[in-house]
Amino acid sequence: MVKKKKNYHYSKSDTHLTVDADELSYEEYYALTHCGKKAENRKKAAQALCDYLCDKFQITHCKVWVADRMYPTRYGHTYMGLYWWWHKVITIYNNMDFMTPCTNRSFADVLLHEFMHHYDYYYLNLSDSVHSKGFYSRIRDLKAKLKKQKK
């Protein structure tokens, strides 16, 4: 029974391989990738990008919280970010180890990953946001559309 339910969530997620947007603004993504390594600056830029994406997809906004500490390790896994769907909060851990911030690119990748969970719940109305082929395809598509500059 559990296996059927798990397969259902994966197959449902895999039906959506791209995000529903033709063009996205480059400015917010650029601001995030060039905001420096301080947690306060990253929080402002991450919240601005998240607000922009929520407005673009017409979904409820979520709060971004940046923890100026090391990534937690649980059960042998390191968590760079978490999405709390019932509170609509994205948590991102700023430091790789004691007082060494992660790179801007890694920080942006974690934000897009956690935002995709929010997108799954509130735009695609999936009952569970699983790490499927479709999930990672949507992240790649979102990142490519954000990085594309208008000419």
Regions found by a protein language model. Give the residues of each.
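N-terminal low-structure segments adjacent to metalloprotease catalytic domains
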Residues: M1-K37
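Short, charged/polar micro-motifs that form catalytic or ligand-binding hotspots
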Residues: G36-E40, P101, R105, N125
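Auxiliary, metal-adjacent structural segments of Zn-dependent hydrolase domains
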Residues: K37-W86, K147-K151
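Active-site scaffold of zinc-dependent metalloenzymes
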Residues: R69-R105, H118-Y122, H131-D141
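Short alpha-helical catalytic segment bearing the HExxH-like zincin motif
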Residues: S106-F115
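Metal-dependent catalytic neighborhoods of phosphoester/phosphodiester hydrolases
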Residues: D128
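Short, basic alpha-helical nucleic acid-contact segments in DNA-binding proteins
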Residues: D141-K147
